Amino acid sequence: GNLPDVIYHTLQYVLPWAEAGILDVDANNDVVKALGKKTFAPGALNMAKSGSKIAAVPVDGWTQMVVYRKDLFEKAGLDAPTNYANITKAIKALSGDNMYGFVAATKTDENFMSQVLEHVLLANGVNLVKKGGTKKQGKALKNSLEFYKVLAKASPPGELYWKQSRALYFAGRTPMIIWSPFIMDELAGLRDSAPPTFNVDPTSNELAQKTGFITNFSGPNNKKGAAWADIRYFGITADADTDEAKKFIMYSMDEGYASTLSIAPEGKFPVRRGNSSDP
């Protein structure tokens, strides 16, 4: 069947869809040029490069987080989970009969596991797509995978992904998970379809008040640590009414950009910093 005029998609699809002819690279590049390349975060553009052109239009992004029970950490005298060592220590201290020390992602066919695992690897300085592969990263890679085993061992049995980690954190059954900032509204009791079950009031913000967030954490081989981020793009397709698709994106990314981001402000961080007159 015919493709939509515009697809809102993640970074991982930009180059494969460009190479497969699904995206109209020329049309998307035209929009980026019209909006002004200097108005975009350079990293968002560089990752969407197909040859000399930008294959899709950057829209927004978010940074993954370690979400943790700040109150339990403080009560146990634990440091915040800013590195492998602190997380491992917290798992040992806070695991119990009714408390899993961590809820990791273990369902291998879920994209969520790729996100969490890559975050853990980057935290320890491991880059899977680095030129030359992982040959020179052997020690750091081994340490990262051993740490992930610690996270998995502290987790409940079964195949786990975002759904279980959120549900168990909301129920007060784990002190730590890795999640996106999209958890923030439901954490505060503002989403009917995914309320906290921490207490009897599904609209309570008690759990939110007891929660802390870490965006950058580190491993023993990378003391400065790293964050993991996801970027989303608009892609005009090969089947599109090109002129109308361009108009839609131009509006959504310019005078309508605040409205675009307000769809989910907790997880839609701007990647366009200004406009052509004030980049």
Q: What spans do the regions from the language model cover?
A:
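Beta->alpha turn/N-cap motifs
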Residues: 9-13, 162, 179-184, 232
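Loop/turn elements at helix/coil->beta-strand transitions in domains of secreted/extracellular proteins
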Residues: 2-5, 53-54, 96-101, 172-175, ...
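Glycine-centered hinge/linker elements that transmit conformational signals in sensory
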Residues: 91-95, 131-159, 202, 207-212, ...
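C-terminal lobe and pocket-closing loops
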Residues: 186-195, 203-205, 219-279
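Hinge/lid segment of periplasmic solute-binding proteins
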Residues: 9-63, 88, 113-116, 202-217
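Short helix-initiation/N-cap motifs at beta->coil->alpha
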Residues: 1, 84-89, 158-171
